[in-house]
């Protein structure tokens, strides 16, 4: 997908390879959509994201002098959902989820469950030890990955 397909007012044929809300996950060709946090606004991460290869920034206020296109939107959450579904083609549409909660044994139960389910279908396991999917192991920065990473992986 190219940038001008997502934003027809931009005259850019740059390929969009992903979107993320966390500058630590930016890769070449990504759109950066920082969300406001408890202790930060998100705009303090623009330079890092652009340096790492962000091809555009989506934000809810105008910030002057960016070297990449800035798309100003009213609702960051709504725009994030739109971008995730367009870029990653709705990966969760037919997904079934199983959650494991409790004090002890969550990792064991989820690992064994994913192992057994992989014999009859395609299963993934997200937890403390990483993300296991398609015979690959992905490290995760957080026990519960950010939404963009879930879309990217699945």
Predicted regions, residues:
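N-terminal leader/targeting and accessory segments in enzymes
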Residues: 1-82, 86
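Phosphate-binding loop of NTP-binding sites
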Residues: 80-154
């Amino acid at each position: 997908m190219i940038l001008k397909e997502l934003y027809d007012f931009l005259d850019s044929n740059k390929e969009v390879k992903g979107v993320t809300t966390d500058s630590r996950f930016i890769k070449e060709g990504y759109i950066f959509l920082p969300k406001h946090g408890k202790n930060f606004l998100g705009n303090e991460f623009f330079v890092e994201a652009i340096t790492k290869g962000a091809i555009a920034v989506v934000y809810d206020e105008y910030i002057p002098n960016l070297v990449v296109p800035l798309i100003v939107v009213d609702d960051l959450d709504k725009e994030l959902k739109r971008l995730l579904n367009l870029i990653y083609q709705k990966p969760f549409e037919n997904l079934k989820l199983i959650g494991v909660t409790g004090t002890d044994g969550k990792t064991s139960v989820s690992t064994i469950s994913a192992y057994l389910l992989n014999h009859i279908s395609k299963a993934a396991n997200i937890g403390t030890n990483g993300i296991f999917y398609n015979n690959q192991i992905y490290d995760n920065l957080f026990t519960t990955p950010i939404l963009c990473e879930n879309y990217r992986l699945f």
